[in-house]
Amino acid sequence: MTTLVERNKAIALRFAQDGWGTNPNWQTTWDELMNADVVYHFNSAAEPIIGLAANKTFNKSLFQGFPDIRQTMEDIVAEGDKVVYRTTIQGTHTGEFLGTPPTGKSVKVNDFTLLRIADDKIAEWWYECNLLEVMQQLGLVSA
C-alpha cells in the first residue's frame, strides 16, 4: 500500500513529465490531475489564476514562446499534502512570450513548483522562476 506522500509525489512527477506544455497530451493530463477550481500562483503575481480552463489558457500562451522548451528534474521533496520540485528549463524563444516578440535566443534557468494536493488532485500550485534572468538572457534588459 502506498502512503499519502508517495501518492502525492507520483502525481507531481506525472504532472511534471506528462503535463509539461510541450507534451502533445498535456491538457488531458491536466484534466486528470487538477481540480476544476485549481488555483495557480505564478511568479508572485498579485492575483492567482483560478480554474482549470484559465490555467490551461495561460499555460498554452507561455509555451508558445518556447515551443522547444525542455526540463530536467533536479530535486523533488514531499511532505503531507505538499510536493515541491526544482527543475532546469531550457529552450529557444521563437514565439511571443509575455507580450515579447521572438528573439531567437536560448535561455536556461532553474525553477520551482510547489503543489498542494487534495483527494489525489492538484488543488493549488505555485510556480517561481527568475523572469529577470530570462529577460536578461533574451537581451531584453541589461544585466
Model-derived features: positions:
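C-terminal and inter-domain tail/linker signature
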Residues: 1-143
